[in-house]
């Protein structure tokens, strides 16, 4: 897919990895819809930087834990730009909570944003993506491919994203490709100290942490070159799953 001039919606585009993904698409000339909820400042800063560089970007606020809002978000983007070519489902929350310590409220928060919102955002985007013969990329995680007991709800939610990606790849074929990226330690949780970061690096066969640029490279492969790839999970982890 030629990206320049096409429309991309990135959920959770105001901070951390979502912002890095959105910025990369804007830098390649995509018309950018930057979704945010609690990160309005970061989204606005990214929008302004893209516009200053000669690009086009608009911020869209929405609480994606509301299924109606999640389904409506892509329709708002189509109303603004007239089309939607790419959907990147990146919005997520991650809490360090074991199975025993997870409350019903925490469970709902994680599953509602990390999994349910992806389903309904995809549902709202389906007709526009089909019309554009577009692409969808869901941000999964290593925690969806191996159990992370300390992040119980998060691990379960991302496993759901992996299976949802395969379901959507079937449902939206042949017009739309749907894939997922499962990053490893490309952007570690903000609360991790130096010891935890070092432990992560040592547990990776490449003996280093990754960076957001590694996830960006995976996204660009799927969008620009992965035209015959659908229903797959691209793992970007420096080999951690080989342990």
Residue ranges of each PLM-predicted region?
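Substrate-binding pocket helix/loop in short-chain dehydrogenase/reductase
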Residues: 98-99, 106-111, 200
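Conserved glycine-rich Rossmann-like NAD(P)H-binding loop of the short-chain dehydrogenase/reductase
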Residues: 30-45
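Active-site helix of classical SDR
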Residues: 122, 157, 165
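Conserved glycine-rich cofactor-binding loop
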Residues: 7, 14-15
């Amino acid at each position: 897919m030629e990206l320049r001039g096409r429309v991309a919606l990135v959920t959770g585009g105001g901070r951390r990895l979502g912002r890095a993904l959105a910025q990369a698409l804007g830098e390649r000339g995509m018309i950018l819809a930057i979704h945010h909820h609690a990160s309005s400042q970061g989204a606005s800063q990214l929008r302004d930087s893209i516009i200053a560089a000669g690009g086009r970007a608009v911020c869209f606020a929405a609480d994606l834990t509301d299924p109606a809002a999640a389904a409506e978000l892509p329709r708002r983007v189509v109303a603004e730009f007239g089309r939607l070519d790419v959907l990147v489902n990146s919005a997520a929350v991650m809490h360090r909570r074991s199975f025993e310590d997870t409350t019903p409220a925490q469970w709902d928060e994680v599953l509602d944003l990390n999994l349910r919102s992806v389903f309904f955002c995809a549902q709202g985007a389906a007709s526009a993506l089909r019309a554009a013969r577009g692409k969808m990329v869901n941000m999964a995680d290593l925690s969806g491919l191996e159990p992370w007991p300390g992040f119980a709800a998060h691990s379960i939610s991302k496993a759901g994203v992996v299976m949802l990606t395969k379901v959507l790849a079937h449902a939206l074929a042949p017009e739309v490709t749907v894939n997922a990226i499962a990053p490893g330690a490309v952007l570690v949780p903000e609360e991790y100290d130096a010891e935890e970061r070092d432990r992560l690096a040592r547990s990776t066969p490449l003996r280093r942490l990754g960076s957001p640029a590694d996830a960006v490279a995976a996204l660009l492969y799927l969008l620009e070159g992965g035209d015959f790839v659908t229903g797959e999970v691209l793992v970007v982890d420096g080999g951690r799953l080989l342990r």
